[in-house]
Every structure is written in structure tokens, then in C-alpha cells.
Amino acid sequence: MWQAYVRFKSGSTTRADVGETEEEARGALQDAMSQLKSNGIGIVGPNLVVTKDDLEFIKLEQKQRD
């Protein structure tokens, strides 16, 4: 499982699952970035919404397994 690590300008952070494979995760992140560019709001994963004004950065990482 791959997840997006999101940091907001306020300093808070969160993670959201975005894909089973790296390719799927990269596609989901590209979609979110396209949404941000076109309307200022992007959906990262199934339940995380970010805005261009609040977002500092997003990076992909492989989810740690227990």
C-alpha cells in the first residue's frame, strides 16, 4: 500500500492511502495535482481534500506494515 504524506502550511501533517501499487499511487497524486491547478482544490485518496492555499507539500511513501 502506498500513501500520500501531506504537510499543510499550518505545520500539521496527515497521511492518506492512495494506491496498492506505486504506479496507481502516482496516478492518484497526478490527478490531485491537476485538480489543484485547475480549481484550487484536490482530492488525495478516498477522504482527504486539500486546497492550494493550505498545502505546503505532498510526497508518496510506502505504508509501513506491522
Set out the residue ranges of the language-model regions:
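Short aromatic-glycine-(Arg/Gly/Cys) micro-motifs in beta-strand/loop hairpins
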Residues: 1-12
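Residues that cap or initiate secondary-structure elements
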Residues: 12, 22, 64-66
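Short, mixed charged/polar active-site loops
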Residues: 12-14, 47
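Short acidic, gly/pro-rich beta-turn/loop elements at beta-sheet edges
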Residues: 14-16, 26, 60
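Short amphipathic beta-strand/extended segments with alternating polar/hydrophobic composition
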Residues: 15-20, 51-55
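A short, charged, amphipathic alpha-helix used as a generic interaction element across diverse proteins
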Residues: 20-42
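Short, mixed-charge low-complexity intrinsically disordered segments
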Residues: 36-66
